[in-house]
Swiss-Prot record:
Keywords (A to Z) from UniProt: Carbohydrate metabolism, Cellulose degradation, Glycosidase, Hydrolase, Polysaccharide degradation, Repeat, Signal
Single GO BP term: xyloglucan metabolic process
The name this protein goes by in its record: Xyloglucanase
Catalytic center residues: D70 (nucleophile), D479 (proton donor)
Annotated signal sequence range: 1-32
Gene from which the chain derives: xeg74
């Protein structure tokens, strides 16, 4: 996850001496604003949502496992509930860079000791030097030693490793391999002080991209490995190997405890060593790539060094000399229980998927986790269960040979449990995957891969809203788009899609019509020239559709606002200035009187009023964004952070938080006259984000929530009296580094939501507090997930695990209608987890099935299972086949968007102009209709749509959409397919009820043969059944 903090960063004065800073990580809070205890929890997404570059198993204690992230800190595995515990939430605003973890070492002699090398960037983005954090209680508390150079937890090569290691014979000794040409460093007092190993000859030469500031630094040392057999307990290990990011001489060895070093003779050259692992039999395995990762890598090899003879052997599953090698090698794991058993991962095989390779004979022969079985078909050695985070499909339905979800990408680290040959974990750009039956691979049985990231929440949050109805929270996120959070403690079933882009940069809802929402990001126009960077929702963020138009030539992004009644949009693009639309995004016109890249918001009462902020100036529009005028407001920050927000329910009331630490105004300002003037609050020294929530009992004004510094203390604060007084609502154990956004909840007094840059979304409530009228939630039992899928295809069937949160109750039964499932045959239990048998699931009918979990007390919980069948269906008679699914499957929607795949099953070319596809539906209120072709293989301009009423209404249909092609669409060769994605709506955008439509495919999420649409060639029915 490469996330640049686009804000001026605080620079604390850091000593460059090597002596340790002997202070606890959680100092006592100084006298400041009064505090109120809050309970803090992550909003659950279930997968993490960011890059996990390192997973580290302790070699001497089972189940002691750590994970490090690039911007979200470090975690420790909790075997009791198979989740991860965050260890660095104490990191605050000023020392935010400590959440970038470039290396982690767990002590193999004293398992209570653990060390982190922290620092986020080695360039100008990070003013702070790096540090070594050390703990004697497994990361519960930390002490810090500041280093005289920077550390790059979010820099290129961050999944190399580990750069920080503990001597397995004398655990007082640690080594750290630095970046930026700073070489090798050594500590002999448990990491308290450090000195440079001046005899080490090569600090590294490789630079990823000299022309780019982010990639222009020397990557440096990549990993360090001890040969434990060369030492004895209590004395320094004598033989040490170091991998360096250098394409000439990259592997160095010391045989005298680090006093002298030489390059290992005969070593391969030309590539960069990603990992080096020494097996118990004396074999040193090394993965190489022509890039340092995590995104690059187009060639690579795997080598083995016989450390006894000095012989090097190229053991690559697919060597770099092969035309089939289009990737490097990254992740490397050696089975401590079985010498000679190892695995490697591609870095990166983006298409059709990553590849894991496994060898049982030291790399002489390999098997791979998937292989082609008659292109485009693939044969899989695995099943994949994403029920813990169903959104990991990323909303895609790719055509073979691709599948969704994927095994992953950016697999720079892969580990086999040293105590359990069946357990393997690996990190990806989005989550941690793993298996508990790895050795099935060796018996030609499938391994079961599932998400193993419970507790990891690593997303970078760009925007949050809490509407007065619908879901309590909707998020805009970096890299994973965003979610509607219907249950804060359960993973969302899907991410935003249609439009689907990596990051939602800005999000808004209509205050007086909260189900109407808008979001913007940056679409991939290269992949889809018809893409749009703006999405709209009419159901509170459950479903989205792209606008029909956008400002000409824009790359998207920026900020967006919607009027209080939902009738008008104002979009400040990242590149083409500010534009407005009064046609629901069907057309856009440039606004006047406001500079490009201004931040825009809407008044929460007056539907014609919008505001903008740029370079210390406030702009207001009273005509729906058509024109803006600069107000007389003065004294606001010219640069730095800027958060302008309008108060719900009060026209013209604004708050502004912003400024920076480098000088100039910084703090919190208030306006009650639509931005004509602002008053600065004297009791707030610094502020970076402001939000609003339900008023306190007995109060009329909204509760205020701020990310701020008050009375010399940084934290999160609440004011119930319009900013006259503040209480701190976090403590020093819950700081979460840099917080990007804050908001309250308009329905729950005291509730606050935080968006962070790498620790996901947090929410909190007062401990034992009064929520101001909303009934506190009753503690019931629950299940996770609440929705999942099962494929009747025999090759893809797998048991479904369901985690129970019992809360003191017991499971009484599981029911499917009147049928009570039988434990032992229909399902099994292990602790608080249920495993639904694939044998039972295979008896279910296609469609949505509901299993009701009944407990000894409290409410039932329902698991919704979408049963599908991707088994090849015998084709009906005819020269064409039509597959279809609906892009929007909600019961009601203001647009219907079927997606078709048309295949020529005949033996001769087919003129597309002769083909007609019909979709049958009910009009649900006669109105004129609009037709849109969102995308088509043959070109959207070559697709036509015609509406007509049926001669007589039939069951499920009174109207039909006929889709045709122009002569310019050309021909479709025998055996080939073409795709058409269309959408239609009423001109007034009133809703259709889809559930009773003949052609509606309620449960399909990917292309399936669908007989309820019909296809004609030259007027003759060739596919489907007419209603």
């Amino acid at each position: 996850m490469k996330t640049f903090l686009g804000k001026k960063l605080w620079m604390a004065s850091l000593a460059v001496a090597l002596a340790a800073g002997s202070f606890a990580a959680l100092p006592e809070m100084t006298s400041a604003a009064p505090s109120e205890p809050y309970t803090w929890k992550n909003v659950v997404t279930g997968a993490g949502g960011g890059f996990v570059p390192g997973i580290i198993f302790n070699e001497s204690e089972k189940d002691l496992i750590y994970a490090r992230t690039d911007i979200g800190g470090a975690y420790r595995w909790n075997p009791a509930n198979e989740s991860w515990i965050p260890l660095t939430d104490f990191v605050g605003w000023d020392d935010w860079n400590k959440n970038g973890v470039d290396a982690l070492a767990t002590d193999p002699v004293d398992p209570d000791r653990v060390y982190l090398a922290v620092g986020t960037y080695t360039n100008s983005w990070d003013k702070n030097n790096g540090a070594i954090l050390r703990s004697t209680d497994r990361g519960d508390t930390w002490q810090t030693t500041t280093l005289p150079f920077k550390v790059g937890g979010n820099m290129p090569g961050r999944s190399m490793g580990e750069r920080l290691v503990v001597d397995p014979n004398d655990n007082r000794i640690l080594y750290f391999g630095a970046r930026s040409g700073n070489g090798l460093w050594r500590s002999s007092d448990y990491g308290a002080t450090w000195s440079k190993v001046t005899s080490f000859p090569n600090p590294g030469t490789y630079v990823q991209d000299p022309a780019n500031e982010y990639g222009s630094d020397i990557v440096g040392l990549a990993w360090i490995t001890f040969d434990k057999s060369s030492g004895q307990v209590g004395q320094a290990t004598q033989t040490i190997y170091v991998g360096v990011a250098d394409t000439a001489q990259s592997i160095y060895r010391s045989t005298d405890g680090g006093a002298t070093w030489t390059a290992v003779p005969g070593q391969p050259t030309g590539y960069l060593p990603h990992h080096g692992v020494l097996d118990a039999d004396g074999s040193l395995y090394i993965t190489y790539s022509n890039g340092v990762g995590p995104y690059d890598g187009t060639k690579g090899d795997v080598w083995k060094l016989n450390t006894s003879t000095g012989a090097w052997t190229n053991i690559s599953p697919i060597p770099s000399s092969s035309a089939d090698n289009y990737f490097g090698y990254g992740g490397l794991a050696v089975d401590a229980q079985e010498p000679g058993t190892l695995m490697v991962a591609t870095l990166n095989s983006w298409w059709p998927d990553a590849i894991l390779f496994r060898s049982k004979d030291g790399g002489t022969t390999w098997t791979r986790i998937w292989e082609f079985d008659g292109y485009p078909n693939r044969k899989f050695r695995y099943t994949q269960n994403i029920s813990a985070a169903p959104w990991l499909t990323f909303g895609t339905t790719p055509a073979p040979p691709e599948v969704s979800p994927k095994l992953g990408w950016m697999i720079g680290d892969l580990e086999i449990d040293p105590f359990d040959s069946d357990r393997m974990m690996y990190g990806t750009g989005a989550t941690i995957y793993g298996t508990n039956n790895l050795t099935n691979w060796d018996n030609n049985e499938k391994i079961d891969i599932s998400v193993m990231a419970k507790g990891v929440e690593e997303m970078a949050v760009l925007d949050l809203v809490s509407p007065p109805s619908g879901a309590h929270l909707v998020s805009g996120l970096g890299d994973v788009n965003g979610f509607r959070h219907d249950d804060l403690d359960q993973p969302p079933a899907k991410m935003f899609s249609s439009p689907n882009y990596a990051s939602t940069e800005s999000l808004d809802f209509a205050e007086l019509n909260p189900s109407t929402m808008v979001r913007v990001g940056k679409a991939d126009y290269a992949a889809d020239p018809n893409a749009k960077s703006i999405g709209l929702s009419s159901d509170g963020g459950t479903n989205w559709y792209k606008a029909n138009a956008e400002p000409a030539g824009t790359a998207g992004g920026g900020t967006v606002a919607i009027s209080s009644d939902g009738s008008k949009l104002v979009w400040s693009t990242s590149d083409k200035g500010v534009h407005y639309s009064s046609t629901g995004g069907n057309s856009w016109t440039a606004s006047t009187g406001i500079p490009a890249q201004a931040k825009v918001i809407s008044d929460r009462v007056n539907p014609n009023k919008f505001y903008g902020f740029a370079a210390g100036k406030i702009y207001v529009s009273v005509n729906g964004g058509v024109s803006f005028s600069q107000t007389a407001a003065a004294g606001l920050p010219v640069d730095g952070n800027a958060d302008l927000d309008a108060v719900p329910g009060v026209e013209g009331e604004l708050w502004f938080a912003g400024g920076n630490e480098d000088g100039g105004p910084y703090g919190l300002w208030h306006s009650t006259d639509s931005g004509a003037s602002f008053a600065k609050l004297s009791n707030v020294e610094e502020a970076d984000s402001i939000g609003f929530g339900k008023a306190a009992p007995g109060r009329n004004s909204a509760a205020l929530y701020a990310v701020a510094q008050i009375d010399g203390t940084r934290g999160f604060f609440r004011s119930d009296d319009g900013g006259a007084s503040w209480v701190r609502i976090n403590d020093d154990a819950h700081q979460y580094a840099r917080v990007t956004t804050i908001t309250g909840d308009p329905r729950i007094y005291g509730r606050v939501y935080l968006g962070t840059n790498g620790r996901g979304i947090l929410y909190a409530d007062p401990v034992g507090g009064n929520n101001g009228g909303e009934t506190p939630p009753v503690s019931h039992s629950g299940i996770s997930p609440q929705s999942t899928e099962f494929d009747l295809n025999a090759d893809r069937q797998a048991d479904i695990p369901v985690a129970l949160t019992l809360n003191g109750n017991t499971l009484a039964s599981i029911r499917n209608g009147n049928h009570v499932l039988v434990q032992g045959s229909d399902y099994t239990m292990s602790g608080s987890q249920v495993f639904l048998s694939k044998t039972y699931l295979a008896t279910l009918s296609k469609g949505v099935q509901s299993l009701v979990f009944r407990f000894s007390a409290g409410n039932d919980a329902t698991l919704s299972i979408t049963v599908k069948d991707t088994t090849q269906v015998p084709l009906p008679e005819g020269s064409i086949r039509i597959e279809m699914y609906n892009g929007t499957t909600s019961a009601t929607a203001n647009s219907i968007n079927p997606k078709f795949k048309l295949t020529n099953t005949g033996t001769a070319p087919l003129q597309l102009a002769d083909v007609n596809i019909r979709y049958y539906y009910t009009i649900d209120g006669e109105k004129p209709l609009n037709f849109f072709c969102d995308w088509a293989t043959a070109g959207s301009a070559n697709v036509t749509g015609t509406f007509s009423a049926l001669p007589a209404a039939v069951n499920g249909a009174d109207h039909v959409l006929e889709i045709g092609f122009t002569a310019s669409a050309g021909t479709l060769a025998a055996g080939q397919s073409t795709e058409v994605q269309v959408r239609f709506s009423k001109t007034d955008w009133t809703n259709f009820t889809q559930t009773d439509d003949y052609s509606f495919a309620a449960s399909s999420t990917a292309y399936e043969n669908w007989s309820k649409v019909t296809g004609y060639v030259s007027g003759t029915l060739q596919w489907g059944i007419e209603p």
